[in-house]
């Protein structure tokens, strides 16, 4: 487990010296371009029980996000609101131990599924962890969610990526049911199942729907993306370009890309 000094919002535990350098660069680009870091809410309650012993520091992930994102959404836009809500949800699921303290979701009604797989209620989703939820529809030889612990699932990907930022690409409908496309990316500098990365950029593209209540809390989330190819890239069985062939071959049309991803994602 990471101690409070090295509790990061990324996969790489950082020394104080490393964190100081990252923060210095982060502040520099914020001043230079007038950019703001993502807003992850609900992190300041002194009674929060943090999973790793302390409040996470997202400086590394935020730095990578600002430098490598493909979209800059205007302040107050629906895209930015959705982006920050999802980032808050990810933070709470990854770092707040008790599901009852997660304020980005409605604790009584929240449910989530990925690629047409099992629908998880709030408490169970928190117990098994985001990765087991989002990879649940994969065959067991790709990802065995039934026999992978919360800790094991997070270690697998945090050992592969120093940071893995996420961004909203486009939003196609407003509340209460928000439909959106997204991008998740990172440089494979670590190791996954004994396969060493070479620093290659690994990108995930997908789409999702999120239902929110009048408090802008998530009540239902459905996510679709090509999970199997992602794992095969980390195993060295495919190249990163293979994972994005459908998305990029459609000439940038999100609906054609989504249809191509959906045809692979849903079980037959």
Task: Go through each PLM region and give its residues.
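C-terminal and inter-domain tail/linker signature
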Residues: 1-268
């Amino acid at each position: 487990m990471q101690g409070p000094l090295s509790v990061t919002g990324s996969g790489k535990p950082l020394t104080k010296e490393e964190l100081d350098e990252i923060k210095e660069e982060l502040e520099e680009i914020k001043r230079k371009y007038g950019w703001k870091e993502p807003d992850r809410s609900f992190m300041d309650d002194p009674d929060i029980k943090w999973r790793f012993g302390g409040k996470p520091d997202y400086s590394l992930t935020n730095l990578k996000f600002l430098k490598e994102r493909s979209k800059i959404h205007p302040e107050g836009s629906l895209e930015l609101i959705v982006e920050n809500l999802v980032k808050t949800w990810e933070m709470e699921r990854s770092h707040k131990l008790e599901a009852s303290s997660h304020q980005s979701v409605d604790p009584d009604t929240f449910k989530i599924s990925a690629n047409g797989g099992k629908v998880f209620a709030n408490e169970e989703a928190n117990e098994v962890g985001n990765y087991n939820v989002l990879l649940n529809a994969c065959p067991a030889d790709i990802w065995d969610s039934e026999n992978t612990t919360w800790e094991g699932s997070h270690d697998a990907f945090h050992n592969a990526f120093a940071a893995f930022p996420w961004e909203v690409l486009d939003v196609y409908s407003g509340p209460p049911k928000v439909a959106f496309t997204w991008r998740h990316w990172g440089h494979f500098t670590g190791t996954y199942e004994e396969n060493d990365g070479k620093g290659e950029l690994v990108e995930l593209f997908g789409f999702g729907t999120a239902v929110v209540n009048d408090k802008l809390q998530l009540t239902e989330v459905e996510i679709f993306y090509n999970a199997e190819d992602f794992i095969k890239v980390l195993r060295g069985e495919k190249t990163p370009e293979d994972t994005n062939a459908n998305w990029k071959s459609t000439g940038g049309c999100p609906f054609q890309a989504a249809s191509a991803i959906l045809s692979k994602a849903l079980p037959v």
